[in-house]
């Protein structure tokens, strides 16, 4: 049975995730005018595009909201963001830059916390401003139902009556004026913006065209680092981590993680750090483009990743990257709280993040131009004396040890050579073109692989005696 209502539930309370912009303002007024009982819920997620969240409920009541609440979600959002940071839950990379999934993080928090707040008020119908072409409609749908299985969804933008009457911004503003209602006549931008404490998203309109650069965007969390007229002073920043969590910046310890993130944003923002231009695959597998800001997350990530690489071995890091990428896609799809995501999160935080303790100092200049100055911690597996090119008194191994290690490699090198010879003997259209003409080997005469593992000292022995000599005296292996 569908949970989506396609017509206005007259006489019933309808919760609206209310931003105070034109779209949600007219939606509240229109629903009240048509006989529904709108109730507005505004999430305080530290958004940088709304300087006065506390004043939003008063505006909502002007448009007819029976209940108008601000719900502080900053602490929960910061915690989820720190979990994503620890897990490397970032799967989108374009032009050499990472997208830190800041919008999906915000949706995971608002989609659950707001629905819980509505349910406390006896509101079990929810609407928001997401369109049918985007990701948010599915993210909110999933999180909403997980938080309240009784929830039904009503979105004015999926209601033919609403769309027919108020299909565009001009019609919306005219409708409010004709009904004697105010609205914020903000200047029309060349793109749309959505923000929270972790980052800002700029998309749509002119940014849909790939011949329009990132530089048309006016940053709201940072500076125009590409503009030579903007003066940016070089700055050294030290970030301290304990068990995978950032705890201090420049020696100042933060008891409140929200304050730490705000300070990280301020530091990274004044250098233009963490701004990226991404082409991504939406949940429905259609490609879209967004310009993102995440100065604090970028600062925390580059220092966390540096420390992690100094601690964990190659296979752990490889598993971390694979699992983190998968987790990032789950987060993007609105599955951050699903069992498959929780399994990955718990594993990564337990076995990788829990030992990431230490400090990294980075010298920030403009944008992504920075230098790592110092890395230290109590559990680093980086020990320069083990591989020093200078003479050391406590070297971990010597020349003879390395000769033995190289000799053991003969086994798999011989196997690889045998396979290459086999491929080279295949018809041209199967193997020879690739192996002989597509690599550096040239011709590969058969039989070379046997020479790799030959032992001159046992060449005179019969085959059976040689096998006996190589066998274990007891047991099997």
UniProtKB/Swiss-Prot annotation:
Pfam family, one: Arginosuc_syn_C
GO annotation terms (biological process): argininosuccinate metabolic process; L-arginine biosynthetic process; urea cycle
Catalytic reaction list: L-citrulline + L-aspartate + ATP = 2-(N(omega)-L-arginino)succinate + AMP + diphosphate + H(+)
Keywords: Amino-acid biosynthesis, Arginine biosynthesis, ATP-binding, Cytoplasm, Ligase, Nucleotide-binding
Residue positions binding L-citrulline: 99, 135, 139, 192, 201, 203, 280
Subunit architecture: Homotetramer.
Protein family membership: Belongs to the argininosuccinate synthase family. Type 2 subfamily.
Protein name in the entry: Argininosuccinate synthase
Originating species: Nocardioides sp. (strain ATCC BAA-499 / JS614)
Phylogenetic placement of the source organism: Bacteria, Bacillati, Actinomycetota, Actinomycetes, Propionibacteriales
Gene assigned in the entry: argG
